[in-house]
Amino acid sequence: MGLKARRAAGAAGGGGGEGGGGGGGAANPAGGDSAVAGDEERKVGLAPGDVEQVTLALGTGADKDGTLLLEGGGREEGQRRTPQGIGLLAKTPLSRPVKRNNAKYRRIQTLIYDALERPRGWALLYHALVFLIVLGCLILAVLTTFKEYETVSGDWLLLLETFAIFIFGAEFALRIWAAGCCCRYKGWRGRLKFARKPLCMLDIFVLIASVPVVAVGNQGNVLATSLRSLRFLQILRMLRMDRRGGTWKLLGSAICAHSKELITAWYIGFLTLILSSFLVYLVEKDVPEMDAQGEEMKEEFETYADALWWGLITLATIGYGDKTPKTWEGRLIAATFSLIGVSFFALPAGILGSGLALKVQEQHRQKHFEKRRKPAAELIQAAWRYYATNPNRLDLVATWRFYESVVSFPFFRKEQLEAAASQKLGLLDRVRLSNPRGSNTKGKLFTPLNVDAIEESPSKEPKPVGLNNKERFRTAFRMKAYAFWQSSEDAGTGDPMTEDRGYGNDFLIEDMIPTLKAAIRAVRILQFRLYKKKFKETLRPYDVKDVIEQYSAGHLDMLSRIKYLQTRIDMIFTPGPPSTPKHKKSQKGSAFTYPSQQSPRNEPYVARAATSETEDQSMMGKFVKVERQVHDMGKKLDFLVDMHMQHMERLQVHVTEYYPTKGASSPAEGEKKEDNRYSDLKTIICNYSESGPPDPPYSFHQVPIDRVGPYGFFAHDPVKLTRGGPSSTKAQANLPSSGSTYAERPTVLPILTLLDSCVSYHSQTELQGPYSDHISPRQRRSITRDSDTPLSLMSVNHEELERSPSGFSISQDRDDYVFGPSGGSSWMREKRYLAEGETDTDTDPFTPSGSMPMSSTGDGISDSIWTPSNKPT
């Protein structure tokens, strides 16, 4: 019962200490752990004095060297307990069972497989011995064919074959077993797959054939004699010497690499053979062979097959001499084709020889390159561990777990360890002498760590631990649970011996983790630089050919980079294809025309659906596009600012000179003064861009202000209105209806104000008072100048002007200036805003898409408002 409770207490304390670097275990060190310890002391039957002696003996060492405290059963329990430890990142305990036997089994299996299938080093000696055995069997089998050596060689051959059968049988069994180290040959299905390999089938066949030969021995019966011929099957054992087929692979690669050359040589040689054989057959088929007595014998070239035999022997430079041409014609043909055919028959031998030489050289170079694999793998591993040991990367845990299992961590100096060990042994001896249950008490105090060892050998004495113990690092981590428990006990008892010896209880493993990690980090940096240096040494060129190849590769890479850079530069600075159609010719006869594709309402940078050509996507094309946009914006801003300044100037003039005064003597005097001060009249220059007679390109007319509607439209013909037209009431009644239209619309010059000076009126009856219903010439002159100012608004409506980027709002409200004693609506109230009828570019070339307002298109204006011209309507 006490043992189970101690396990639970140790597990609770260890879990709290190991979880977050002492956070859980140190939360209540004097409360929970002390209470649990007191309960366990009562359960195991310890007296208070015994506990104090044990604490006095073991308290000072718990937080300094845990390996000495655990050595009581550490050797035995290390083989059986599940290894648990806390990682360098203070994670939860990890359970990683070490399968030493399994690893050893796999290592031996891999070693045997490599020795039999991929021999290197000492394994080549075994294969050389097998080759000598096979060669000896073959030599003895040849000697048995001699009568004088048949008996002796037969006896030795029987012994050697028996030995070879055992050797080859054991080797075959080892091959089948060792093949399990490969993933594709694991299990009985994988072993069957391995046994179906060609060389394994050859071994099985030779073993089966050798067993009956050895069984019958040297008997003289017919069965034994017939079975002895199977001994020559041992020649097939020579094939098994090259288990990996390197020879055949080399020959096959040479033939495949020069297959076209070989086919060409064999093809031309075959054509030469059949042609020469046929011609010699035609010439020599009717020539009989003469013997020594002069008698005729059968012809040497009786058939075409005889001629082919002669051609093959001759062109292959063998020359048996059994068949030769007898006539001079045949000899001439044979000599001619021999000079041609021999060269082509000998050509494949040279091709194969050069191909094999090149392949051998390539294999040597490949072996040289294979030497880079290990340094490259070491460099990659060192680079990863150098990266994984970055203290800022808290998510990389696997590398720290690796060091947890391989790093030996000596906590103290050697002299401190020896002194502490000797002093602890003395104290433990005194405790054991005073209390025979001391050893059991120690074991039960450390039950969470050494349960199995305490149960089997409770009276084992602790032994000092050397600094090379592989379990020291992991064991020290497991001591944290006891360290927290011991710190709580020391806090309650106030052990003076701890203070005298100068060891603090707060010296835990967490204090050493940053130092250990920094040391590991430094080692990783050094190893990374070392492996990098080794890898650079292996990059040295193999021969001059490698140097030339490296220079050639570098030159090609440099050329490709230069070409790429040149392409990018050309793309940036070379103008691409034009993004817009060709400019249209400017229209003749118009006072002012805009460049094509640059209408104020249709900006040049706005993409059009009708444009088929793609825009230039180069950097220079984009620069040009932005420059055009900025230029167009500048022109629009200049236009708007100029128009605004002109408008404000005229407003200031009107405010200054038309403000009503109370001291006006009479209408006649006022008109006289105004005539003296103002002599300029507003003129509107209209030009019809439509086709027609160019006699009057411009027409001048004057418009009185009382004939102007709210939006600047005239009720009657301007010429008639200036010469004593009807009253304003009658003029308002004659305003144009919405249904009236006009045939032609003028094109007004942009930003053009022409003031016609020195204009006088001959009829004094037209002059009226300044406050009468009829407008005086001075008022007409000023009002006409402001109401019908020939400012081209560049086809910009009110909304566009209000959104103008210049910041000037043309349609901004201003103070109403009243010109008249009645205080009613005056012309200034009606003309505060620029009328849409005053916009200019409503001609066909610049008419925007979509419906336009009637005031802009002129659909609601009659033809009588424009000056009559000679143009046909």
From Swiss-Prot:
GO terms for biological process: action potential; action potential initiation; apoptosome assembly; cellular response to ammonium ion; cellular response to calcium ion; cellular response to xenobiotic stimulus; endocytosis; establishment of localization in cell. The keyword Iron does not apply. Pfam families: Ion_trans, KCNQ_channel, KCNQC3-Ank-G_bd. It comes from the Eukaryota. KCNQ2/KCNQ3 are ubiquitinated by NEDD4L. Ubiquitination leads to protein degradation. Degradation induced by NEDD4L is inhibited by USP36. Residues 304-316 dip into the membrane without crossing it. It is found in: Cell membrane. The chain crosses the membrane at residues 122-144, 155-176, 195-214, 227-245, 258-283, 328-354. Heterotetramer with KCNQ2; forms heterotetrameric M-channel responsible for the native M-current. Interacts with calmodulin; the interaction is calcium-independent, constitutive and participates in the proper assembly of a functional M-channel. Heteromultimer with KCNQ5. May associate with KCNE2. Interacts with IQCJ-SCHIP1. Interacts (via the pore module) with SLC5A3/SMIT1; forms a coregulatory complex that alters ion selectivity, voltage dependence and gating kinetics of the channel. This is Potassium voltage-gated channel subfamily KQT member 3. It comes from Rattus norvegicus (Rat). The lineage of its organism: Eukaryota, Metazoa, Chordata, Craniata, Vertebrata. The gene is Kcnq3.
